[in-house]
C-alpha cells in the first residue's frame, strides 16, 4: 500500500499465510483475499482468515476442465456501500461509518473503492485515506462541490469479529477441440456466531430490543441527561413537546444556544443516520462543540436521536450458471440464484421475507462480420425478487442516475446488498466498428418495478479518430421515467463530448463539453419539481507530456439553472481553473503539484442554497533519495 493510505495499526497490513502447492491445486492457510464468481449473482469479494482450497482436475472425454474452490474462514471485515453527501468547497475529510451508524470504524486497508461521479478513483492520485479513522480526503485534482456524487465501497471491522464465511464453487467446462459449454455451481454462507451478545456487551434490555425489532432497526435511546456545562465539548440539548399539523404531538430535542432556566433538564444526545426519509432530524452545521441536529418532522430527515444496536445476521446463497458456445464468439446462457437473508437471528419476527430468488438470461456475440465493419451484440435480462440478498453490488455504481431513480430506492448495503422491491431490467448493447478509427455504440434498456416505477433509456456513443491523432468522442443518453410512488414523471437528457488534437512534442490541446437537462414533473401537471436542474459546461485545456514531465491545465465555464417557485431560472455561473504538474527526472527525485480554484456568481434568490463564492485547493508533495539510499526525504 502507498503512504496515501495510512493506518497506525501495523497488524492491519500484515498478511501471514502458509501455502502448499501441487500440480493439481493448492491449499492456503492464514490470510487471503477471496474472489469468487466475479460478475455473477453470487459473486463475493472479501478479506478473510482461514483455509482456501483450489483444485484443478484434468479433463477426460467431453470434460475439458474441472475447477473446484472451497473456503472456510473468519471474516476480517464487514462489507458496506456508503453514499457521501459532499459539502460545497470541502475536500475532506469525509468519514466512513459502520452499517449501524458507528462513527469510528477501522477500514481494512486496500478494500476501499471510491467512485466520484461514477468513475473509480486511484488512491494517492485522487484521494488519500486514513484507515484507522476511516477519513477520506480528495486531492485538488477533483474539486468537491455540492453537485458531485460520491460513493464508497469498503470493508471495515469494529474490532469484535464474530462473523464466519463458508464458500464453495465448482466450474465444469465441456468440449473436445474447443469449449462448447460450461456449468458452474456455488454455495455460500456468512453468519455471526452464537456468542454475539457477549462479544458486543449487550444488556438484557438490548437483547429484548433486538428480539422485538425483527428485521427493522434495533435501537436504544441516544439521550443522556447531564449537568449544564457551557464549556462541554459536545452540543447540549433541551427537550420539548411540539404539535404536528395532523393534530398529534412529538417530543423534540432542541440545541441550546444560551444557558437554560434553572432546573431545566439538559441532555447530551447521540444521533444516528437511519436513511433518507426515515428520520426526523437533519444535520444543520458545525459548531465549536460539535455537529448540531435540527428537527424537521416525521419522514423529513435522515437522523434519529437513538443509538443503533448491532444485529447478528445469517446469509445463505446458492447459485447456478450455465452457457453454450453456439459458434466461436457466440454465447447464450443464464444464471439462477436463491438467497436466504435473516437480518436479525435473535428475533423470530419478519421471517416470511427471508427467501428470495433472481435470474439472468444473456446472449453475447463478440464479433459479427458485415459488409462494412464488424458488429458486437449483447442482450441481457435480469430479474431480482424483492428481498433478494447478494454479497456485493449487482447494479452499476450510478444505477439510480442511470434510470432516474431516487437514492432511497436503491438496495440496502449493510453487510449485504438487499433488493427493496421486485425488479426486471432488459438491456441491449450494440457496437459497430466501421474501421479502427470509427465506431458507434448504441444502448437500449427498460426497467420495471411493478406498481412502482418504470423507465426507458436510450444512449448513443460516437468515436472518430484515434488517441494518437485527432479524435472526437461523444456520448448522449435520454431517460424517460414514471414513478408511481413519488407521483412524478421525468425526462433526463445528458450529453458529453471531447475533442483532442495532438500537435507533436507532447502537446495536446483539447476541449470538452457537458450538458444536462433534468425535468421532474407531477404525473398530472406541468409544474417542475425542485430537483430539476440543468447546466452547460465548456472546458478547454492543454496537456503536455514528456518522458520526465507531465502537465495539464484547464479552464472551465459553467452555467446552471434551478427551479424557483415552480420556474427554472439561472442559478449561477462558475469559472474553474485546474492544473497538475508532475516532474520525475529519475529514481532519486520527484515532485507533484496540484491546483484547483473555483469562482461562483450566484443570483440573490439562490444565495442561501449556494453560500460559497470561491473555493481554493492546493496540494504539493515530493521525494528525494540519495544514491545508495543513505538519505531519504518525503
Each model region followed by its residue ranges:
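Surface-exposed, low-hydrophobicity segments enriched in Gly/Pro/acidic/Ser residues
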Residues: 1-634
Amino acid at each position: 500500500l502507498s503512504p496515501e493510505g495510512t493506518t497506525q495499526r501495523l497488524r492491519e497490513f500484515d498478511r501471514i499465510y502458509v501455502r502448499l502447492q501441487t500440480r493439481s491445486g493448492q491449499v492456503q492457510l492464514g490470510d487471503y483475499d477471496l474472489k469468487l464468481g466475479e460478475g455473477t449473482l453470487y459473486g463475493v469479494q472479501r478479506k478473510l482468515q482461514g483455509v482456501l482450497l483450489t483444485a484443478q482436475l484434468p479433463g477426460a472425454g467431453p470434460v475439458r476442465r474441472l475447477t473446484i474452490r472451497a473456503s472456510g474462514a473468519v471474516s476480517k471485515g464487514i462489507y458496506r456501500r456508503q453514499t457521501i453527501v459532499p459539502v460545497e468547497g470541502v475536500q475532506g475529510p469525509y468519514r466512513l461509518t459502520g452499517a449501524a451508524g458507528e462513527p469510528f470504524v477501522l477500514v481494512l486497508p486496500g478494500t476501499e473503492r471510491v467512485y466520484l461521479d461514477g468513475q473509480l478513483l486511484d488512491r494517492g492520485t485522487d484521494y488519500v485515506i486514513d484507515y484507522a479513522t476511516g477519513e477520506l480526503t480528495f486531492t485538488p485534482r477533483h474539486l468537491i462541490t455540492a453537485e458531485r456524487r460520491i460513493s464508497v465501497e469498503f470493508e471495515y471491522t469494529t474490532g469484535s469479529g464474530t462473523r464466519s464465511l463458508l464458500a464453495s464453487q465448482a466450474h465444469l467446462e465441456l468440449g473436445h477441440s474447443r469449449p462448447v459449454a460450461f456449468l458452474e455451481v456455488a454455495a455460500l454462507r456468512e453468519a455471526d456466531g452464537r456468542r454475539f451478545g457477549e462479544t458486543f456487551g449487550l444488556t438484557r434490555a438490548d437483547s429484548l430490543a433486538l428480539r422485538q425489532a425483527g428485521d427493522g432497526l434495533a435501537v436504544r435511546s441516544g439521550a443522556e441527561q447531564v449537568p449544564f456545562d457551557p464549556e462541554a465539548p459536545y452540543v447540549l440539548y433541551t427537550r420539548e413537546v411540539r404539535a404536528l399539523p395532523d393534530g398529534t404531538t412529538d417530543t423534540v430535542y432542541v440545541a441550546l444556544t444560551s444557558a437554560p432556566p434553572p432546573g431545566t433538564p439538559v441532555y447530551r444526545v447521540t444521533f444516528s443516520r437511519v436513511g433518507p426519509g426515515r428520520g426526523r432530524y437533519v444535520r444543520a452545521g458545525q459548531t465549536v462543540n460539535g455537529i448540531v441536529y435540527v428537527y424537521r418532522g416525521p419522514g423529513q430527515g435522515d437522523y434519529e436521536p437513538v443509538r443503533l444496536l448491532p444485529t447478528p445476521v445469517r446469509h445463505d446463497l446458492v447459485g447456478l450458471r450455465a452457457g453454450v458456445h453456439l459458434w466461436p464468439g457466440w454465447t447464450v446462457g443464464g444464471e439462477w440464484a436463491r438467497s436466504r437473508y435473516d437480518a436479525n437471528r435473535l428475533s423470530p419476527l419478519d421471517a416470511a421475507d427471508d427467501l428470495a430468488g433472481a435470474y439472468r438470461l444473456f446472449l453475447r456475440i463478440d464479433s459479427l462480420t458485415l459488409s462494412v465493419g464488424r458488429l458486437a451484440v449483447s442482450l441481457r435480462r435480469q430479474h431480482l425478487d424483492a428481498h433478494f440478498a447478494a454479497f456485493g453490488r449487482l447494479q452499476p455504481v450510478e444505477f439510480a442516475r442511470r434510470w432516474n431513480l431516487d437514492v432511497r430506492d436503491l438496495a440496502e448495503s449493510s453487510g449485504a446488498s438487499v433488493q427493496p422491491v421486485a425488479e426486471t431490467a432488459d438491456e441491449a448493447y450494440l457496437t459497430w466498428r466501421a474501421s479502427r478509427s470509427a465506431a458507434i455504440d448504441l444502448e437500449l434498456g427498460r426497467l420495471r418495478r411493478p406498481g412502482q416505477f418504470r423507465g426507458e433509456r436510450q444512449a448513443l456513443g460516437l468515436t472518430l479518430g484515434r488517441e494518437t491523432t485527432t479524435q472526437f468522442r461523444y456520448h448522449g443518453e435520454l431517460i424517460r421515467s414514471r414513478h408511481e410512488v413519488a407521483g412524478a414523471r421525468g425526462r433526463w437528457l445528458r450529453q458529453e463530448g471531447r475533442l483532442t488534437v495532438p500537435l507533436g512534442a507532447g502537446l495536446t490541446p483539447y476541449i470538452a463539453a457537458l450538458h444536462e437537462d433534468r425535468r421532474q414533473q407531477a404525473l398530472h401537471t406541468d409544474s417542475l419539481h425542485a430537483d430539476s436542474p440543468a447546466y452547460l459546461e465548456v472546458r478547454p485545456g492543454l496537456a503536455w507530456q514528456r518522458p520526465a514531465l507531465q502537465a495539464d491545465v484547464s479552464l472551465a465555464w459553467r452555467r446552471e439553472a434551478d427551479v424557483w417557485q415552480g420556474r427554472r431560472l439561472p442559478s449561477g455561473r462558475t469559472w474553474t481553473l485546474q492544473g497538475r504538474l508532475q516532474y520525475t527526472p529519475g529514481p532519486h527525485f520527484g515532485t507533484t503539484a496540484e491546483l484547483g480554484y473555483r469562482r461562483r456568481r450566484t443570483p440573490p434568490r439562490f444565495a442561501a442554497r449556494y453560500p460559497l463564492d470561491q473555493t481554493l485547493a492546493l496540494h504539493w508533495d515530493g521525494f528525494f533519495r540519495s544514491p545508495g539510499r543513505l538519505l531519504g526525504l518525503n
